[in-house]
Amino acid sequence: MDYAALSPHLGGWALRDHHIGDSSLRGGAINWGNLGSRITSALNSTGRWLYNTGNRFVHSNTFNQIKQGIQDSGVIRNVANLAGETLGALTDIGRLKLQQDLEKLRRKALGEEGPATQAELQALIQALQAQVAAGEPPAAPAAPAPAPPLVPTTRPIPEMVTEVKPPVTSSAPAVPVDVPTTLEMRPPPPKRRRKRARPGQWRARLDSLSGTGVATATRRMCY
């Protein structure tokens, strides 16, 4: 196996051990880390220059003279007055258009003009809804009158009339109905718990293991 293929490369040229630790060990032809830091530094310096230039211009005499000239000329006041007059004119135009539509609808309802189209009615309804939303809420509509009772308008045909007969009752004896019954059974006796065989004393346990038990003897000796 060629272990040199695992070493760092600069393009197609492998870096040997005498290059490790110096500036040649960059991992490629372009140092991306250095490029990013340079771009960040350039952006920071550009923003700092723009901020300083704008700050100096705002605090300069030229800017103060321009601002004072605009205030003395009354341009801002004229623009505000013009905006207010334009808004008032638009409101008057909308009110006049609504009055004209109402007058036209009244004439058409009285028959003085042709019937109103569906588009005109829809536009008028939307205008009234907008006016009601801006002003007072509309009055509640009156309850509709009750409908008259339905009256048949045709006579019945004898051939199509069917006679209603009473239900037929049979004289046969009634069939007994099976009623389910339940048997009373005694509950099952409780289960007895079997006692587990427990060994007795330790001597009996030893007897079961060895078969002969442990022989003990007491002997008194004098010295």
UniProtKB/Swiss-Prot annotation:
Induction: Expressed in the late phase of the viral replicative cycle. GO terms for cellular component: host cell; host cell cytoplasm; host cell nucleus; viral capsid; viral procapsid. Residues 47-73, 206-212 are annotated as: Interaction with hexon protein. Residues 29-53 are annotated as: Amphipathic alpha-helix essential for membrane lytic activity. It comes from the Viruses. Residues 166-182 have a biased composition (Low complexity). Residues 138-151 have a biased composition (Pro residues). Residues 136-155, 166-203 are annotated as: Disordered. Residues 189-198 have a biased composition (Basic residues). Residues 1-28 form a propeptide. Pfam families: MCPVI. Keywords: Capsid protein, Cytoplasmic inwards viral transport, Disulfide bond, Host cytoplasm, Host nucleus, Host-virus interaction, Late protein, Microtubular inwards viral transport, Phosphoprotein, Ubl conjugation, Viral capsid assembly, Viral penetration into host cytoplasm, Viral penetration via lysis of host organellar membrane, Viral release from host cell, Virion, Virus entry into host cell. GO terms for biological process: lysis of host organelle involved in viral entry into host cell; microtubule-dependent intracellular transport of viral material towards nucleus; viral release from host cell. The record marks G28, A29, T212, G213 as: Cleavage. N-terminal amphipathic alpha-helix domain is essential for the membrane lytic activity. Belongs to the adenoviridae protein VI family. This is Pre-protein VI. It comes from Fowl adenovirus A serotype 1 (strain CELO / Phelps).
